[in-house]
Design a protein with these regions (language model features):
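Low-complexity, Gly/Ser/Thr/Pro-rich intrinsically disordered linker/tail segments
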Residues: 171-232
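A local structural micro-motif
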Residues: 78-79, 119
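Acidic low-complexity segments
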Residues: 1-77, 84-90, 94
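Active-site nucleophilic cysteine motif
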Residues: 62-66, 96-111
Length: 232
């Protein structure tokens, strides 16, 4: 049996360059709560956040300090299934090794711990000739609204010595994105009957029958960019 779907969407990705001097003293408090079992303000994370941020009170600069820490200290590594990890940020920070999703949820957790609203996003990195899975984060600073942080791509740029690209990925994304998930560890709609392969991240969905879930080696999936055009 073959199941297919074609999705059309538009992406507006204006470049922003927020300045700390323009940040409001009063900031919102939404999306600053814990979300167990991974977005949890443990004693270790509280101590680390204090070490990273110090006495900084400017929301934009707090987020930048967290971004700088992750992108300059950590490197990309493939991960075991998230389902097997008790606490993703602590796992990542214990060795400063992890994939794009681990880096994103660590950024979200540290931002929230420091009072900066932050959310998870994941989906596809869709260049005109290819499409692949990717995760990133976004954070909210008034008066600018939602800004992006791609710690994985930013860290890669930093290690390559491309500081312009490193700075770009704090606040911005290029237009090669198709977000499919804007919340971490959320249920599908309609909900799954059986245990998910990954109950936290979702980039391309999962498969189940009426009687059981299907494992990755039991089906094939293929994602392609059919057409890409610049809009006026």
């Amino acid at each position: 049996m073959t199941v297919s779907a074609e999705i059309a969407y538009e992406i507006d990705a204006p470049y922003v360059q927020p300045h700390a001097r323009e940040v409001y003293a009063e900031q919102p408090v939404f999306d600053t709560e814990e979300l167990p079992p991974h977005v949890v303000f443990t004693p270790y994370l509280r101590a680390l956040a204090k070490e990273i941020v110090g006495d900084e009170t400017n929301a934009l600069l707090k987020a930048r300090k967290i971004y700088d820490f992750i992108t300059t200290q950590a490197v990309y590594r493939f991960m075991p299934p998230y389902l097997t990890v008790p606490n993703i940020p602590e796992y990542f920070l214990s060795g400063l090794r992890g994939d794009c999703g681990v880096q994103a949820i660590t950024f979200v957790t540290l931002c929230r711990l420091c009072g900066v609203p932050a959310q998870w996003q994941s989906g596809l990195y869709t260049k005109p000739n290819s499409a692949g899975h990717h995760d990133w984060a976004r954070f909210y600073v008034a008066p600018f609204g939602w800004l992006f942080a791609d710690c994985s791509f930013g860290g890669s740029a930093y290690r390559a010595g491309d500081l312009d690209r490193w700075n770009f990925y704090f606040g911005n994304l290029e237009p090669w994105r198709m977000p499919t998930c804007s919340a971490f560890q959320q249920e599908f709609n309609p909900p799954r009957r059986f245990l998910r392969h990954d109950p936290y991240d979702n980039q391309s969905g999962e498969v189940e029958s009426l009687t059981r879930r299907l494992y990755a080696d039991e089906y094939e999936d293929d994602c392609r960019v059919v057409r890409y055009e610049e809009m006026e």
